[in-house]
């Protein structure tokens, strides 16, 4: 059944396509004739043909091929369906084929027949020709009163030659025949009984089939003689009552059976809906729980990997700074001990030569020793400040690389205290916005998620004009769904190309390139992406300042050691 329905639909679609192509071919000559007429008119007016249609070509309206095709297909399909329903009402053989291969045909035919039956336009077929009347009429042999005596042998011969239904009716009707035939023989004069017998009456709400049968019996009573007609009328009334009772009983049984079938189908449909809904809800819940578990596991793994990497980098930085400071301290201490030993040796030598003569030299040496101790303390202090600066810069970098926005104010203050009077570091720290110091900045992952959420809205507004109204927005919403989504690194300034390049840049971790691509948008997409652009610019500015501070921090230790 499904295969036959699909074949019928394919045949109807091919017919509609062929009809549309024929209509287009028929419309082409008309178009050519119109163009020729216009060219002739332009030639008659002294203007070249191209000048005549130059403005018209610019104002050429859309052909709406898709809309015309849909309308034509709808009208052709509706006409074919209506014609099939009409012919099915006229031909039973075509009706069986039409109901079998066309969906919803049976419901339409049943509805039309029910409406015709209710309005009284659908009637039971009755014999319309003499041949049909002869075929549907039961022949009854002559009996009852007649103008001559009937021989018993002739009556028997005629009764035997009749068919079985006619013979049964003849037996019931011809039972009073002897008394009726005796009277004309005894009287000896032919008489005709012209007494009319009343016809069988029915109520107006009787079944049409019963009405047709009663009408046939009434015609038979009107034709039959009066004596037999009275008996036939009484029996027919009994038969009609029984027939009407049987028809009413059959109708009630059919209605009850139909009602039971409908209730059974409704209960089965309700059970099927309930079971299907429970199965679908259980599957959706299971799939949702599985996705949540996978996301939680992936998030935990990513956090663990990031924290491990951050801990290793911090430990490496601490060890590097500590080793560098220890090396400086040991070198200064060794130099001081060496100088102190040298001074002691010189002093001992001087004392040997004479204490009083060398007091001036001893004072000079002590002064130099004090200067050396002061320089050593300054070097140790600078080394401590350098280590503190490197540690504060590492904490700021770690906060920027975290998975959640963190207020940068404490890290900025720690770097400011460790930087001292360095003008470049102070300028870089002053350039950090107050919002970032109090609320922090969004992470690259958060910016990527926000861009994914913003991307459909940008695509919907990609076709909105600059000063568009409600119609422009609705048109952009509808036609933007027909655009193809680009991938890779396409060229061009259209919204799809810009979104594709921005997605690639975000996937590669190049936030600066993604912000630059989104910054090239214009119109409504630029307005919708303004908040995301502000967050992205703030993030890139903070990263740039953090890089400047880190590079200056590397040079800070070398400059301090030289001083």
Curated annotation (Swiss-Prot):
Residues 38-51, 149-170, 178-190 have a biased composition (Low complexity). It is found in: Mitochondrion inner membrane. One of its GO terms (biological process) is cristae formation. Residues 90-563 are mitochondrial intermembrane. Pfam families: Mitofilin (PF09731). Disulfide bonds: none annotated. The chain crosses the membrane at residues 69-89. InterPro entries: MIC60. This is MICOS complex subunit MIC60. It comes from Yarrowia lipolytica (strain CLIB 122 / E 150). The lineage of its organism: Eukaryota, Fungi, Dikarya, Ascomycota, Saccharomycotina.
């Amino acid at each position: 059944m499904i295969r036959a329905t699909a074949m019928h639909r394919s045949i109807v679609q091919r017919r509609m396509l062929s009809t549309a192509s024929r209509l287009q071919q028929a419309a082409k000559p008309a178009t050519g004739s119109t163009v020729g007429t216009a060219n002739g008119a332009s030639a008659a007016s002294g203007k070249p043909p191209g000048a005549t249609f130059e403005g018209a070509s610019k104002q050429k309206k859309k052909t709406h091929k898709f809309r015309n095709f849909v309308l034509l297909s709808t009208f052709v399909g509706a006409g074919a369906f209506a014609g099939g329903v009409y012919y099915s009402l006229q031909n039973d053989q075509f009706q069986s084929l039409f109901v079998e291969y066309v969906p919803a045909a049976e419901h339409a035919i049943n509805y039309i027949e029910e409406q015709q039956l209710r309005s009284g336009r659908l009637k039971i077929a009755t014999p319309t020709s003499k041949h049909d009347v002869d075929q549907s009429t039961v022949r009854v042999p002559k009996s009852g009163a007649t103008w001559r005596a009937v021989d018993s042998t002739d009556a028997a011969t005629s009764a035997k030659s009749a068919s079985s239904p006619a013979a049964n009716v003849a037996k019931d009707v011809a039972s009073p025949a002897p008394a009726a035939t005796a009277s004309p023989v005894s009287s000896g004069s032919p008489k005709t009984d012209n007494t009319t017998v009343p016809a069988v009456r029915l109520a107006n709400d009787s079944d049409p089939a019963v009405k047709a049968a009663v009408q046939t019996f009434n015609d038979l009573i009107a034709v039959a003689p009066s004596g037999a007609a009275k008996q036939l009328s009484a029996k027919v009334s009994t038969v009609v009552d029984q027939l009407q009772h049987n028809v009413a009983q059959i109708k009630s049984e059919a209605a009850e059976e139909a009602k039971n079938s409908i209730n059974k189908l409704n209960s089965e449909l309700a059970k099927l809906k309930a079971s299907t809904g429970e199965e679908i809800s259980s599957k959706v819940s299971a799939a949702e729980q599985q996705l949540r578990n996978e996301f939680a596991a992936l998030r935990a793994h990513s956090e663990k990997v990031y924290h491990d990497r951050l801990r290793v980098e911090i430990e490496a930085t601490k060890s590097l700074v500590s080793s560098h400071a220890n090396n400086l301290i040991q070198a200064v201490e060794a130099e001081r001990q060496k100088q102190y030993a040298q001074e002691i040796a010189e002093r001992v030598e001087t004392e040997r030569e004479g204490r009083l003569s060398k007091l001036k030299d001893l004072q000079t040496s002590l002064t130099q020793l004090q200067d050396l101790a002061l320089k050593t303390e300054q070097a140790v202090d600078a080394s401590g400040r350098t280590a503190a600066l490197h540690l504060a810069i590492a904490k700021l970098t770690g906060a920027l690389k975290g998975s959640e926005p963190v207020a940068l104010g404490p890290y900025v203050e720690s770097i400011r205290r460790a930087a001292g009077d360095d003008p470049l570091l102070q300028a870089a720290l002053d350039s950090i916005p107050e919002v970032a110091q109090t609320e922090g900045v969004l992470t690259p992952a958060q910016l990527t998620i926000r861009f994914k959420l913003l991307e459909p809205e940008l695509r919907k507004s990609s076709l909105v004009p600059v000063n568009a109204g409600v119609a422009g927005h609705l048109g952009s919403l509808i036609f933007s769904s027909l655009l193809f989504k680009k991938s890779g690194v396409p060229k061009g300034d259209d919204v799809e190309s810009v979104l594709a390049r921005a997605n690639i840049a975000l996937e590669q971790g190049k936030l600066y390139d993604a912000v630059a691509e989104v910054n090239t948008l214009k119109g409504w997409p630029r307005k919708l992406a303004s908040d995301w652009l502000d967050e992205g610019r703030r993030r890139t500015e903070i990263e740039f300042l953090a890089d400047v501070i880190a590079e200056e921090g590397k040079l800070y230790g070398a400059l301090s050691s030289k001083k």
